[in-house]
A protein has these predicted regions:
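Juxtamembrane/interface motifs at transmembrane-helix termini
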Residues: 6, 125-128, 181
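A structural signal for short, hydrophobic/glycine-enriched beta-strand patches
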Residues: 18-176
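Hydrophobic membrane-insertion alpha-helices, especially the h-region
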Residues: 3-19
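Hydrophobic, aromatic-rich alpha-helical transmembrane segments
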Residues: 1-2, 180
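A transmembrane-helix-recognition feature enriched in membrane-embedded lipid enzymes
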Residues: 176-202
C-alpha cells in the first residue's frame, strides 16, 4: 500500500512540474539578448494574441519590442463585446500608452478564437513576407497557440515561442487554485481536439 501511495504521489508531482513545461514552451528562455544567428535572432514581428489576462500579454510584447527582439508588434483579437472596441485596438491603445509608436503596431480585429488568430494573422504575415515571428500569449495557452499558427503558416515562417510566465490567472502555483486546474484541463482537451478535429474549431 505504501509503495502504491508513493507511486501515486510521484506521478502527481511529475504532472504538476511537467504540465507548465509542456503547455508553455519558451524558445527565448535561454537568450540573454538578441543575436545575429540562431533562435535568439531579432524577429520580423512580435505577435500578441488577446484573451485571458490580455494586458499582461501586451506588457510582455511591449517589453520584448523595447528590448529589440522584434521590428514591429501585431495584436490579434476581436471585440469581447461586439458593440465596443476590438481587443486588438484596445491592445494597441495600451501599447501606445506604454510608449510604443503607432507606426510600429498593426492590428487584426476579427479573430474570435485561437484558430482564427492564427488564420487571420497568417494572411498579414504572408502579405508582408515575414519570415520569423515571436508568438506571445499566456503560458497555459502557448502550446496550443503555437500549434494553430504552425498549422496555418507551415514551414515558411519560423515561430519563436515566448509566453507570459505569470499573470492574473496563471503562476507556478497553478495546481493550488481551481482556475489553474480548469485552465490545464481545458487546454489539454483542446490540444487533443486540435489533433483529431477539423481546422478552425477551437
Amino acid at each position: 500500500m505504501t509503495k502504491i501511495l508513493a507511486l501515486v504521489c510521484l506521478i502527481i508531482f511529475i504532472f504538476i512540474l511537467g504540465v507548465p513545461k509542456y503547455l508553455g514552451p519558451d524558445d527565448l528562455g535561454k537568450c540573454a539578448e538578441p543575436a545575429a544567428v540562431g533562435t535568439c535572432q531579432v524577429a520580423d514581428a512580435i505577435v500578441v494574441v488577446s484573451g485571458g489576462d490580455t494586458n499582461a500579454r501586451v506588457q510582455e510584447g511591449v517589453t520584448l519590442f523595447k528590448q529589440g527582439w522584434g521590428k514591429q508588434l501585431i495584436f490579434s483579437g476581436a471585440a469581447a463585446d461586439e458593440t465596443g472596441l476590438s481587443n486588438a485596438l484596445a491592445m494597441k491603445k495600451y501599447a501606445v500608452k506604454l510608449g510604443v509608436s503607432e507606426a510600429f503596431i498593426s492590428t487584426e480585429e476579427f479573430s474570435r478564437n485561437t484558430a482564427e488568430n492564427a488564420q487571420n494573422t497568417s494572411r498579414y504575415i504572408e502579405q508582408n513576407n515575414l519570415s520569423r515571428i515571436i508568438l506571445v500569449t499566456s503560458a497555459y495557452h502557448q502550446r496550443r497557440a503555437s500549434l494553430e499558427f504552425s498549422r496555418r503558416i507551415g514551414d515558411t515562417v519560423q515561430i519563436i515561442n515566448h509566453p507570459v510566465a505569470q499573470d492574473r490567472q496563471w503562476s507556478g502555483y497553478w495546481w493550488a487554485t481551481p482556475i489553474g486546474w480548469w485552465l490545464v484541463v481545458g487546454e489539454l482537451g483542446k490540444i487533443g481536439i486540435f489533433y483529431i478535429a477539423p481546422e478552425g474549431t477551437i
